[in-house]
Structures are given as structure tokens and as C-alpha cells.
From Swiss-Prot:
Listed InterPro entries: Dehydroquinate_synthase, DHQ_synth_AroB, DHQS/DOIS_N, DHQS_C, P-loop_NTPase, Shikimate/glucono_kinase, Shikimate_kinase/TSH1, Shikimate_kinase_CS
UniProt subcellular location: Cytoplasm
Predominant location category: cytoplasm
Cofactor: Mg(2+); NAD(+); a divalent metal cation
Keyword Methyltransferase: no
Residues the entry annotates as binding ATP: G10, S11, G12, K13, S14, T15, R114
GO molecular function list: 3-dehydroquinate synthase activity; ATP binding; magnesium ion binding; shikimate kinase activity
Catalyzed reactions per annotation: 7-phospho-2-dehydro-3-deoxy-D-arabino-heptonate = 3-dehydroquinate + phosphate; shikimate + ATP = 3-phosphoshikimate + ADP + H(+)
Organism for this UniProt entry: Thermotoga maritima (strain ATCC 43589 / DSM 3109 / JCM 10099 / NBRC 100826 / MSB8)
Enzyme Commission number: 2.7.1.71, 4.2.3.4
Residues the record lists as binding Mg(2+): S14
Record-given protein name: Bifunctional shikimate kinase/3-dehydroquinate synthase
Residue sites binding substrate per the record: D32, R56, G78, R131
């Protein structure tokens, strides 16, 4: 694979190129820096000593070399597109134009080692006017409203050809496809969020409804609005609503689709890692009511789910780690892919090979569990690993769900080790990996408040016991009924 990035100075070619190299295991080459290395002097000195014409000659020679190389992502110089021969070479490659308006570029750039700006940043407008017709010959990505990870995700998605990773037929169809998100443009109606539209709007069909991000969408008010819109459209039972977003949005979409006209078609395109490895698979749909999370819901399997790990690249830090926690949970439940967590730097840099394998293992394990227990009566309780104490941390500390579950996994495992149930080696390995993913120390909590939360947990069985899932050995899940108040010994 070869990816070339073109654009004005300050458009982010080098920054985004470096991220892409880590995501796709490609070599990163900055053409200006490579010319400097070969010449043994800065671009500014080359301009001063030999002139711009000499520099452009060296630039053209280098470009001809690079289009013959494999597995590279290249940040071109801003003026490479002026030469028509260069443009013809670049048109034969996966070339993306990173756009930002001149006023944004002026905020981003410094004049250091930029000979064309020796007279000041205002020259950017003049340079843009001369070059914009050439940039327009390439696929454009507007970076002005996107952060670095959002831009990276969009460039990678544009550059990738479809590659199928896995197909799961039961309990419902799930396809894991790199580049598969682009199929969403063929959907009849999409429910999505403003953030998803901001990043991926170019792929969404015109027929779409926007809803809030996160748990805010899971209310009767938004359900009513969706019903009114569907009635206004005269939406028939034979058509499909596609939920495009995170877990809250897919929960909401599933609830609406399963109740409107007693059920219309339903598909998901999950855009967060947590939704890909958990919420979009298994047929649980719900909204919140009277302050209680997921208290009104349905069991309704989607007709199909398209999972593209590429779109998780755009996630905010923190939210991304929440998804990694869920994937870690599924990995230790299945016993597959534990070696992925021996590459923490690859996970941190969102390497797509590692992410794709994590998603594949997680979805396959979730599908296996749901097949055996579709209505959450037994084995599916294994998915509650870390959730008993995780619920306590989520409520008392106000942290995101994924972080709370990570702390819950750590503390519940330590409790079971102290009881002589989980072996020391297993406990140490799990705790080490959890701390690696979420390096935030587990806080002490008010024991009395924790006690009240535990006693009111919906997972409490008759006789005030809780069925606690645990990993005795990696890949071996077991259950133990315990007095939930005993768990308090590890939370203070």
C-alpha cells in the first residue's frame, strides 16, 4: 500500500502521516525532510543557495522513487502539485488532499524553515490562490473541524479497499470488514449523531435523522420524536433503519425499530470500540426511564451488523480505552488473543491489525455466549465480569463505564484470590494488564454508600447473594454465589 498526502503547509500532512504509519504499519516519509537528509542542509538553505527550481527538481526525482516503493505513507511538500508530471504520478496512487482554509493554516504554521513565508504568513493566501486549482484534482478531506484522530480515521477509511476479516452467521449476521463502513451510503434510513455526521457525513445517505450522543438519547422524548418522524415518512415494515453510532445510539435505534409497527428492519454500523465488541451484538435494546438505566427494553436481533474497526480511530482518548477494557474482558473469557495485550504500544497507537483481531475475537466470543443464552438466563451473566463492583465505582466516582469495569475486574479478581479461588498467577496477570489499559489508581470509596448500592444491584439473587463470574484460568469462566457485602473488604 502507498498513501500520499498533499496539501498546503500547515494542513497536517506530517502529523497525520506519522499516525497513519503507526495505524497501518507503514513507513512514514516526509519528502521535505528526506530531501534535507540527502542534501545535508535545510530547505531554506537549498532555496537560498540553489534556488527553488533546484529544489523542485530534487522533489520530482524523489517522488518518482517513492511511487515505486511499497508500504509507505508520504507527506509531500506543499508545492509538489504545481508540476503537471507530479500530479499525473499522484493521480495513479491513493492520494488525499488535506484541506484547511487559509485563516486556519495561518494559525497553525510557523515561518521557521519555510522559505516561501519569509515575507510573513500572509503569503499563505497568495500561495493558496495559485495552487488551489491543482489541489482540486485530488480527493479532498476538510480538516478544519476535525482533530488529529478524526482526520486520521477519515484518511485511512478513504485509502482502504474493503477487506473482510470475519463473518458470523448466528445468532445474527455480523460482518467485520475493514473499509466496510462505506456501505452505509446504501441504507434506506439512518439514525445517527451530530459527531458521526461531522466526521463521516460524506458516506451517510441523505435520508437520516440526528440524535444526541451518549445516554441522553435513551429517553421516551427521543423515542416519541423518532416515531413521529417515521409516521411522517410513512416508513413501511419492509424497510430498514440503520443505527450508526456508539452503544447508546444502537440501543436506542434497536428499541425504536423493534417497537414501531411491531418491528421494522434493523441494522447497525457501530462507530465506537465499545459498541463494536459489545452493544451492537446480541439483540439487547433499551432506553432509560425514571433515572434507571436500561429499564425499558426489548430482545430483538438486528438483521445484520457491519463492523469496521477503522472508524474507531476517530474516538476520543478515554472513550477508546473503555472499548479496550471490554475487548480485554472478552479476550480473557475466550482465552484467545491474550498475546495482543503484550503489545500495549500497538494498542495505544491504535494499530489496525491489533484492533481488528481484538474486535474479531470479542465479537465471536459474544456471539457464542448469546447463542447459548439469548435471553440472559445463565451463561450470558459471564459478560458481567467486573460489573458488580464496577457499578459501585461508576455511581460513586462518576467515572465512565469502561474505567469502572476495569476497576471492578481488578478488585473482584483480588477478592477471589484472597478467598483462595483464583490462582496467584492468574490474579497477577489480570491486574497487571488492567492497570496497563487504565493506569488510574483505583480510589477508595465510602463503604456505607457502596453497601447500599450493592444491596440494590439488579444482579442480586434471592437470598441476597450475587452470582459473581470470574476467570479461574484465562479462557475458563466460572461462577460463584457470594455474599455481596463480602466484596466491601476490597473497596475501602
Amino acid at each position: 500500500m502507498r498513501i500520499f498526502l498533499v496539501g498546503m503547509m500547515g494542513s497536517g500532512k506530517s502529523t497525520i502521516g506519522k499516525r497513519i504509519s503507526e495505524v497501518l504499519d507503514l513507513q512514514f516519509i516526509d519528502m521535505d525532510e528526506e530531501i534535507e537528509r540527502r542534501e545535508g542542509r535545510s530547505v531554506r538553505r537549498i532555496f537560498e543557495e540553489d534556488g527553488e527550481e533546484y529544489f523542485r527538481l530534487k522533489e520530482k526525482e524523489l517522488l518518482k522513487e517513492l511511487v515505486e516503493r511499497d508500504n509507505v505513507v508520504v507527506a509531500t511538500g506543499g508545492g509538489v502539485v504545481v508540476d503537471p508530471e507530479n500530479r499525473e504520478l499522484l493521480k495513479k496512487e491513493k492520494t488525499l488532499f488535506l484541506y484547511a482554509p487559509p485563516e486556519v493554516l495561518m494559525e497553525r504554521v510557523t515561518t521557521e524553515n519555510r522559505p516561501l513565508l519569509s515575507e510573513g504568513k500572509e503569503r499563505i493566501r497568495e500561495i493558496w490562490e495559485k495552487r488551489k486549482q491543482f489541489y482540486a484534482e485530488f480527493r479532498r478531506i476538510d480538516t478544519s473541524r476535525l482533530n488529529e484522530w478524526e482526520t486520521t480515521a477519515l484518511v485511512v477509511l478513504e485509502a482502504l479497499d474493503e477487506k473482510e476479516i470475519s463473518t458470523i452467521e448466528k445468532p445474527h449476521l455480523v460482518k467485520i470488514i475493514l473499509g466496510g463502513f462505506k456501505r452505509v451510503r446504501n441504507e434506506e434510513l439512518v439514525f445517527t449523531t451530530e459527531r458521526v455526521e461531522k466526521i463521516y457525513g460524506r458516506y451517510l445517505p441523505e435520508n437520516r435523522l440526528l440524535f444526541p450522543d451518549g445516554e441522553e438519547v435513551k429517553t421516551l422524548e427521543h423515542v416519541s420524536r423518532a416515531y413521529y418522524e417515521l409516521i411522517r415518512m410513512d416508513f413501511p415494515r419492509g424497510k430498514t433503519i440503520a443505527g450508526v453510532g456508539g452503544g447508546a445510539l444502537t440501543d436506542f435505534t434497536g428499541f425504536v425499530a423493534s417497537t414501531f409497527k411491531r418491528g421494522v428492519g434493523l441494522s447497525f454500523y457501530p462507530t465506537t470500540l465499545l459498541a463494536q465488541v459489545d452493544a451492537s451484538v446480541g439483540g439487547k435494546n433499551a432506553i432509560d426511564f425514571a433515572g434507571v438505566k436500561n429499564v425499558v427494553g426489548t430482545f430483538r436481533m438486528p438483521d445484520y451488523v457491519i463492523i469496521d474497526p477503522t472508524v474507531t480511530l476517530s474516538m476520543d482518548e478515554g472513550r477508546f480505552e473503555e472499548g479496550v477494557v471490554e475487548a480485554f474482558k472478552m479476550t480473557i473469557l475466550s482465552g484467545r488473543g491474550v498475546e495482543l495485550f503484550d503489545e500495549p504500544e500497538k494498542i495505544e497507537k491504535r494499530n489496525l491489525r491489533v484492533l481488528s483481531e481484538m474486535v474479531k475475537i470479542s465479537v465471536e466470543e459474544k456471539a457464542r455466549i448469546v447463542m447459548e443464552d439469548p435471553y440472559d438466563m445463565g451463561l450470558r451473566h459471564a459478560l458481567n465480569l467486573g460489573h458488580t463492583l464496577g457499578h459501585v465505582y461508576e455511581m460513586l466516582e462518576g467515572v465512565p463505564h469502561g474505567i469502572a469495569v476495569a476497576w471492578g475486574i481488578e478488585k473482584e479478581t483480588m477478592y477471589l484470590y484472597r478467598k483462595g479461588i483464583v490462582p496467584k498467577e492468574t490474579m497477577r496477570w489480570i491486574v497487571e494488564k488492567v492497570k496497563q489499559i487504565v493506569p488510574i489508581p483505583v480510589p477508595s470509596v465510602d463503604v456505607e454508600k457502596a453497601r447500599n448500592l450493592i444491596l440494590n444491584d439488579k444482579k442480586i439473587l434471592k437470598g441476597s447473594r450475587v452470582r459473581l463470574p470470574y476467570v479461574k484460568e484465562i479462557g475458563k469462566i466460572e461462577f460463584l454465589e457470594v455474599d455481596p457485602l463480602e466484596l466491601l473488604e476490597v473497596v475501602d
